[in-house]
Amino acid sequence: MLTTDHLDDVIAGLSFLKKLPHVDANRIAIAGHSFGGQLTLLAAERDSSVRAAVTFGAAAGSWEDWPELRERLLSAVRKTSAPLMLIHASNDYSTAPGNAMAAERKRMGKPRVLKIYPAIGKTSEEGHNFVYSAVDRWETDVFKFLDANVR
């Protein structure tokens, strides 16, 4: 995860979007879930034109067991200038990643929003995947965040 082609693919996708005539290259946000949330943070760090980044359950399943990943993602949230919205359900595998990254951004005085929603379903897996099953819970908050930071 720390050095993979996946991030290069995301960056290539962003570059492609910027070339499309109907895309305002100055108003691009990026979002991702789980591993995609990790890539979202790394892409926002690498591409300074990203205006906002939203993560759902980023690193929730690997934060405690992978110190290199923790430090890499904390480094990314330190370096990116894009406002971050970090989202978990309270019954995600772990909410520690969002809490730690939001605390780091706060310490640095950088824009961030941390949202921990009430438990979705009964299991950690259901909590982790609420991005798909409970859009009505998060969509208003995410669109307000994007309106405030990308418009």
Feature roles, as predicted:
Residues 42-51:
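Conserved hydrolase catalytic core segment
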Residues 80, 86-88:
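Short beta-strand/loop motif that positions the catalytic acidic residue
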Residues 111-151:
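C-terminal catalytic histidine-bearing segment of alpha/beta-hydrolase fold enzymes
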